[in-house]
Amino acid sequence: MNIKLFTHTDLDGVGCAILAYLAFGKENVAVEYCNYDNIDLKVSQFFIKSNPGEYDKVFITDISINENLAVAIDRYAKSGLWQLFDHHQTALELNKYDWCNVLIKAPDGPGLKTCGTELFGVYLLSSEGLVNRYNWTTINNILQFIAIVRDYDTWRWTTMGRDGIVSKYVNDLLDIYGREQFIDVMFARIRMYTDADFPSITPDEFLLLEQRKEEIDRYVIQKKEQLIRARDIYGHLYGYVFAERFFSELGNRLCQMNLGLEYIVMIDICNGKVSYRTTRDDLNLGTEIAHSYGGGGHAKAAGSTFDREYISDLVVKKLFETDEMKGAE
């Protein structure tokens, strides 16, 4: 069975890739990692160029496509080839298509917010025979991994005390190891460890995590001094800072340090990305802010992208191409 997976680049998106590998075998899954600025292009190119019958299933997880692309795919989705699983409010309109499953809260349980890994996992456990592929110890590890990813992605871990810190540890390990090595580590631990041990963070990993914590603390202090206050086009008071690392931690801590600001913007000028964070309940960053700039996301955490070369050219012109220099030419 050949599987194609388009998924997001964060822990939730990577979690979906790990579940796909577990369900279908790593050798049978072709994964393409996407952001908000390239998901439509990547999916449309695949849709146009792929040969009929080349793949048995095509999944889109933890990220969504635009309406025009969904309409085109819908003509071919009746065969069950395509499936989309997302949990972002900006994607709710896609639920009108039978092959799209967009939920904000978990289908079962006490009304907790869900994530792409959980939605995809429920499908794989019920429809793709994942339960029959492994023993119950491994299944319990899979369920535990899903909960860890969900609690981090929905930021629930911050309300769980010591029980929630494992979610942050796992997300930090993704950054420490890098995507491919992290996948290998988690894939092996899910299959090999007893459920009582999973995810079994090692002493060496705890040392790396402590070093990372100290590094984040220094970075937050540095960026706190660089924060600039402004008002957006809607009149919201926000703060922005140029940053390249630790976006979730930095954004939330800057929000806590600046309660008078409605949200925090982190601009990654080198990679053409913008991250938005808030701790308030009266503002939806995904639909009210990021969506206006071609992005999307959650109520309290969202993102968008920009043309890095265009912005870099503007900065260079402002800095160096003065009237005197132009006259000298």
Language model: regions and residue ranges:
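Short, well-ordered alpha-helical segments in soluble proteins
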Residues: L124-V131, R150-W157, L173-Q181, I190-D197
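Long, charge-rich alpha-helical interaction segments
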Residues: E180-E215
